[in-house]
Swiss-Prot record:
<keyword id="KW-0216">Detoxification</keyword>
<protein>
    <recommendedName>
        <fullName>2,5-dichlorohydroquinone reductive dechlorinase</fullName>
        <ecNumber>2.5.1.-</ecNumber>
    </recommendedName>
</protein>
<feature type="domain" description="GST N-terminal">
    <location>
        <begin position="43"/>
        <end position="154"/>
    </location>
</feature>
<dbReference type="Pfam" id="PF13410">
    <property type="entry name" value="GST_C_2"/>
</dbReference>
<comment type="pathway">
    <text>Xenobiotic degradation; gamma-hexachlorocyclohexane degradation.</text>
</comment>
<keyword id="KW-0808">Transferase</keyword>
<keyword id="KW-0614">Plasmid</keyword>
<dbReference type="GO" id="GO:0009056">
    <property type="term" value="P:catabolic process"/>
</dbReference>
<dbReference type="InterPro" id="IPR036282">
    <property type="entry name" value="Glutathione-S-Trfase_C_sf"/>
</dbReference>
<dbReference type="InterPro" id="IPR010987">
    <property type="entry name" value="Glutathione-S-Trfase_C-like"/>
</dbReference>
<comment type="function">
    <text>Catalyzes the degradation of 2,5-dichlorohydroquinone (2,5-DCHQ) into hydroquinone (HQ) via chlorohydroquinone (CHQ). Is involved in the degradation pathway that allows S.japonicum UT26 to grow on gamma-hexachlorocyclohexane (gamma-HCH or lindane) as the sole source of carbon and energy. However, the conversion of CHQ to HQ by LinD seems not to be essential for this degradation pathway, because the conversion rate of CHQ to HQ is much lower than that of 2,5-DCHQ to CHQ. CHQ is more efficiently degraded by LinE in strain UT26.</text>
</comment>
<dbReference type="GO" id="GO:0000266">
    <property type="term" value="P:mitochondrial fission"/>
</dbReference>
<dbReference type="GO" id="GO:0016740">
    <property type="term" value="F:transferase activity"/>
</dbReference>
<dbReference type="Pfam" id="PF13409">
    <property type="entry name" value="GST_N_2"/>
</dbReference>
<dbReference type="InterPro" id="IPR004045">
    <property type="entry name" value="Glutathione_S-Trfase_N"/>
</dbReference>
<dbReference type="GO" id="GO:0006626">
    <property type="term" value="P:protein targeting to mitochondrion"/>
</dbReference>
<dbReference type="GO" id="GO:0008053">
    <property type="term" value="P:mitochondrial fusion"/>
</dbReference>
Amino acid sequence: MSADTETLARKVREEVIKPEQSTLISPDRQSPSLLRREATVEPRFELFHFVFSVCSQKVRGTLMEKGVTFGSNELTILPPQNENYCPQYVRLRLRSEAAAKHRPVSSFTGQSSVDSEGFDPLVVPTLVDHETGRILADSKAICLYLCDALSGGTDLLPADIREAVLKQVQLADTTPHVALLYGADPDGDRRPESMQAVMPGIHAHKIDAVRRNIPLADGDPLLLEAYQHKIVKEEAAASFVINEPQMRTAISKAEQLVTDLDRDLGASTGPWLFGDRFTLADLFWAVSLYRFLWLGYSGFWKDGAGKPRVEAYANRLFARPSVKDAIIQWPGHPPSENVIHLLSNA
């Protein structure tokens, strides 16, 4: 690992991450209970993430399916902490491959895909590969990197169906999760009451938090530019989530994706999208379907929606160990009355 990358990662661990939030995850200990400072091994991979982030969930699930030990560094990205806005963390992401490859974020579409949104240096997750010195900051790219770099564990990206799997991964990656989280259904808010209560004004709080960090960017034009782009994005988001036509379009797109998924499941000869082989596509859909369920949008496939294949598929996904450990049972996940039945069966 390059000394520069090591320094950047260490500064985030030491200056941003709370000691109790820096842990070691291993195949035989998949909950964040072993403090990093008490661990006897230095992991190759180090993940900076947040419990509730769908992008973080995809990467955690991939790491668990591959059966590797990794360092877990949890940031609190909600106001008022907004630890992901700290200069040390933003500088780490600005040194990533995604920062060099993608245009800066400057709009809001309701998705979290870098391909559609542009690169946002103030979000999670970020993966550091201590062996190669590479910094990766786009969840889809991180998962593909792990699939290609690691031969052990589940073969999530089989060579003979690689392109077909990638097509499904891309579809799941374009789901407008962010819009459905921050914005209400104009025809009746389906989100958990606890979430409804904290959402009004949240983008203004995020913008204020960014502005409080701007003085810390003095003498660092790249960091200052990152903060400025973030403000533009959050201003656009604040307008988007109260725009009824845009919200209806986002909800309609999400439901259509589930309809298309049901069609694709009908072509499979096994329990997963590609027969008996559990792939990265299934993992990405697990994250999407669980978020829909959590938010109250399970009507996309239940309650007379006529999509029994998706309903059965979702049940299988939610029972998979990596999905339970990386998403459903990860400590600190916000509560929702829509998933109590899954937690009670854990």
